[in-house]
Every structure is written in structure tokens, then in C-alpha cells.
Amino acid sequence: MTNSTAEKQQPLTLDISKEALADINDMLEKTTAQQRVAWALNNLPDTHIVSSSFGAQSAVMLHMLTQVQPDIPVVLTDTGYLFPETYKFIDELVEKLNLNLHVYRADMSSAWQEARFGRLWEQGVEGIEKYNKLNKVEPMQRALRELNAGTWFAGLRRSQSDTRGKLPVLQKVGQQFKLYPIIDWSNKDLHYYLKDNELSYHPLWEQGYVSIGDWHTTQSLQEGMSEQDTRFFGLKRECGLHEFGDGI
């Protein structure tokens, strides 16, 4: 990356052409994750936020972002059904990294949802999609609005699933630019980053959980399974936050 790309620029606007966006992605493909973050902070519009599931290797993105912008808002959409280990992991990372955590939840409590709709996650793809919209998509949309987010950092990686395999580094999604600094990282890359920076995996990693969401729709990795098979009974990979064309 040249010095000019790291200097503070007039932020990009959402009316950028597809051709110009493609050129930027060509440039970003040739840079490191840390250089992508630096470029984004200098070239993409405020407010910058990062979303986190506080999953298996989430400490990587949280550490990388807070090293250069310590007070960056960290958005968690809490369904009320995270593993107990996840809630403890959140507390640990908030303390260790001094995170500026913003927790968003559905307007309707999890108990009320079950009373009204039953266990949506047991009602096939349609039920799962409704559950995700209530508990993840709508709270995240609210976070983006209330935090006036112009740029959204997320830790998606191409190796995680078929649906993520062709993602660019930078996208326009809804009213935000969305940047994936570690899009081309492998599990080995993540391992060494965690080790080099004295960061921990999620506690359930050692029990074979490679993708960690709600306890009722997350399985440990078994022989013959891919990472994407461990979520939502293999029916879906995406929870809705990172699906494209749904306005978020």
C-alpha cells in the first residue's frame, strides 16, 4: 500500500460507481488485513463500527480494530440464547480489550417469542428465517441507525462457507460500506494472530465448536461435516446479518 492510500481522504460516498469500487477492491486484495483497516478508517465514512458474535476466533477482529481505534463501537446482537460460555467470553474480552460494547436485542423477549410463536428454530427454514429476522436482523438494523454507522467492519472469511466464497473485501450494503479485513485469512492465520497477541479462542473451541451462535442451532464439528453444516441444522449458513439483498 502506498502512503497516499493511508492518508486521510475525503470519505467515499455511496454513489461510487461499480467500476471505481472494483478498482478499490483490486487494490485492497493486495494489502494486509491491518492495511485494509487503516485504509478504511481514513477513506470510508464515519461512524465506523464493528459487529461481533463473540464466536470462536472473534478476538482477532476485536483486537485488530481496537489497536487503531480503541473506542470503536462493538455491536453484539444478543438473542438471549447464546451459550453460557459465550456470555462469560464477552465479559472477559470487554475487560481485556476495554471494548466499547453496544448490545442490541429484539423488542420482544425470548420468552414472549416462544409463547407467541413456539420454538421458531424448530420450524424449518421459514421458522429459522423469522427467528433470525426478529433476533438478529432487526436489532442490527436498529444499531446501524442509532449509531449512525457509515462503515461496518465484519469478520467474514471466504473459507467459512459457499455463500462467502466470492465476497470482495469491500461492499456497499444498504446505507453503509461494509469491509471484511480478514476475508482471505485461513484458520492457521487466525491461530497465529491469537497466539502472537496472547488472545484466547472461545472456550468451546476445544470441544469442537468451530462456528458458535445460539446453543439450540449450533453443533460441534463431527466427521464428514463442513463448518457450514454446524449451524442451523445444516439448513442455512447465514443468520441474516450478512445475507445480501435483504437491506442489511
Swiss-Prot record:
<feature type="active site" description="Nucleophile; cysteine thiosulfonate intermediate">
    <location>
        <position position="239"/>
    </location>
</feature>
<comment type="similarity">
    <text>Belongs to the PAPS reductase family. CysH subfamily.</text>
</comment>
<dbReference type="Pfam" id="PF01507">
    <property type="entry name" value="PAPS_reduct"/>
</dbReference>
<keyword id="KW-0560">Oxidoreductase</keyword>
<dbReference type="InterPro" id="IPR011800">
    <property type="entry name" value="PAPS_reductase_CysH"/>
</dbReference>
<comment type="pathway">
    <text>Sulfur metabolism; hydrogen sulfide biosynthesis; sulfite from sulfate: step 3/3.</text>
</comment>
<dbReference type="GO" id="GO:0005737">
    <property type="term" value="C:cytoplasm"/>
</dbReference>
<dbReference type="GO" id="GO:0004604">
    <property type="term" value="F:phosphoadenylyl-sulfate reductase (thioredoxin) activity"/>
</dbReference>
<comment type="function">
    <text>Catalyzes the formation of sulfite from phosphoadenosine 5'-phosphosulfate (PAPS) using thioredoxin as an electron donor.</text>
</comment>
<dbReference type="InterPro" id="IPR004511">
    <property type="entry name" value="PAPS/APS_Rdtase"/>
</dbReference>
<dbReference type="GO" id="GO:0019379">
    <property type="term" value="P:sulfate assimilation, phosphoadenylyl sulfate reduction by phosphoadenylyl-sulfate reductase (thioredoxin)"/>
</dbReference>
<dbReference type="InterPro" id="IPR014729">
    <property type="entry name" value="Rossmann-like_a/b/a_fold"/>
</dbReference>
<protein>
    <recommendedName>
        <fullName>Phosphoadenosine 5'-phosphosulfate reductase</fullName>
        <ecNumber>1.8.4.8</ecNumber>
    </recommendedName>
</protein>
<dbReference type="InterPro" id="IPR002500">
    <property type="entry name" value="PAPS_reduct_dom"/>
</dbReference>
<keyword id="KW-0963">Cytoplasm</keyword>
<dbReference type="GO" id="GO:0070814">
    <property type="term" value="P:hydrogen sulfide biosynthetic process"/>
</dbReference>
